[in-house]
Swiss-Prot record:
Pathway: tRNA modification. This is tRNA-cytidine(32) 2-sulfurtransferase. GO terms for molecular function: 4 iron, 4 sulfur cluster binding; ATP binding; magnesium ion binding; sulfurtransferase activity; tRNA binding. Keywords: 4Fe-4S, ATP-binding, Cytoplasm, Iron, Iron-sulfur, Magnesium, Metal-binding, Nucleotide-binding, RNA-binding, Transferase, tRNA processing, tRNA-binding. Its EC number is 2.8.1.-. One of its GO terms (cellular component) is cytoplasm. Homodimer. It is an enzyme of class 2 (transferase). The gene is ttcA. InterPro entries: Rossmann-like_a/b/a_fold (IPR014729), TilS/TtcA_N (IPR011063), tRNA_Cyd_32_2_STrfase (IPR012089), tRNA_thiolation_TtcA_Ctu1 (IPR035107). It is found in: Cytoplasm. The thiolation reaction likely consists of two steps: a first activation step by ATP to form an adenylated intermediate of the target base of tRNA, and a second nucleophilic substitution step of the sulfur (S) atom supplied by the hydrosulfide attached to the Fe-S cluster. Transmembrane segments: none annotated.
Amino acid sequence: MSDNADTKKRTRLNKLQKKLRRETGRAIADFNMISEGDKVMVCLSGGKDSYTMLEILRNLQHSAPVNFELVAVNMDQKQPGFPEHILPEYLEKEGVAYHILEKDTYSIVKEKVPEGKTTCGLCSRLRRGSLYGFAEEIGANKIALGHHRDDIVETLFLNMFYGGKMKAMPPKLRSDDSRNVVIRPLAYCREKDIIEFSALKEYPIIPCNLCGSQKNLQRQVIKEMLQQWDKQQPGRIENIFAAVQNIAPSQLADTRLFDFENLEQGQQQGGDQAHRLDVVNLFG
């Protein structure tokens, strides 16, 4: 690579890193994701998103106003051909504390899912359950996942189109069993920025299709639809994500969120600004 090309690469990399760091820091602050003394288990799959998340969190760790610990965890699901040496070599080179959790979920998935069907749903549920339990074992009180803004918007449309729910992917949540707090520090980050950043960093990417599973076709349809929208009208995806944070229950039709029954008695106000959702602190 010529000196000029190398300079351009470093300049672009620094610009992207600053942007991703700024957006991640804002998400952490907005949703109170990390507090003093937290031990954050960073789930590392070997894909672009989790590598980027680990890099940015390590970067923020040096300048954050609170002290917190990071530990990377990868789950070896015993998929044929899984390059088990890649992540340990990378993490040791970077000086990152890590654990490799070995669980043969691959055999379970192959047994339960018919040939040719998408295995991603069951695979992710098994992986999630194992990781949640392991977080307790190592004393981690936060679990960081690498989902980004595009994942959140895609999930919103997946649930609307195929599930009849207006439900996305929250930046912070308590797991169903109430044992774990899950955070998504990349919630404000664009996938295209992560793709470029990952390519410039030349991370040793591990492909996610070693199992031979078909792609999640429903998610792929949504992704392509959103990409087309973004080409036709730049900024549309940003507006959709903003809408997830700007909900007016009185303008929807969920009687659990708004008391339409008592509207005539004046006990409820109408209008766009009426009865915005009260935010409650679920995490103490």
